[in-house]
Amino acid sequence: DEAALKRHQRFAGDDDTRLAAVHRVAHANPSVAMATRGGYGLTRLLDRIDWKLLVRSVEHGTRWVGYSDFTALHLGLLAHGGAISWAGPTAMEDLGRPDERGGVDDVTVSCFAEAMSGELEAVGFRTDPGCDGLSLRGTLWGGNLTMVNSMMGTPHFPKVRQGILFLEDVNEHPYRIERALLQLHQAGVLAQQKAIVLGAFTEYRKSPLDRGYNLKSVIAYLRTQVKTPI
């Protein structure tokens, strides 16, 4: 897009520029609309986005792809029209640099291409002991935990029942992860799902005050509070 390299403070252009770019892409109706990076400032646009236009673009074949702050767009599309979007790589941070410099590997690139073409048959991931054998069907939704939490209580937060909620985050200490997950639990969101899938929570700093407290501690505690499989 013509505005892809714009800059304004921390953002890829001012609000009007970025809003126009989102709408321009939706009008163009490409097969794939991929975020350049994470999507800083997207929450500023949520009340102004023409959601009918974006939902229509999905119905006409556009696959909106991104993660991190782009989670806001995924949730908005689901909330305003039940539209399917894709939590996936970004053009610059992932596909735009080699694997050894933090980009994605060839297997991920191939899987992504198959997913976009509709040829991907299955994906796999490791689970903790005791979680094997679950067979579930439901709306797969979620994304960045901080973004999911920030949108609760807004009209852009989808009301998903019997879904499979996946969550990830970066640069957040385990206690912040626990606090965010408990907020979802106390708001009743976790109990309404069939399963919670926790992805990678990376690049946080440990503290001497943790005294053994870590992500495993968070998950173990959460399982004592939540009946939904994690």
Question: What are the roles of these predicted feature ranges?
Answer:
Residues 1-29:
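ATP/NTP phosphate-donor binding region
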Residues 140-184:
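Oxyanion-binding "anion nests"
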Residues 32-34, 65, 164-166, 197:
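Structural motif
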Residues 32-43, 47-48:
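N-terminal glycine-rich "phosphate-gripper" loop used for MgATP/nucleotide binding
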Residues 82-149, 153:
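Conserved anion/nucleotide-ligand pocket segment
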Residues 51-76, 84-91, 225, 229:
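Short, acidic/small-residue loops that bind anionic groups at enzyme active sites
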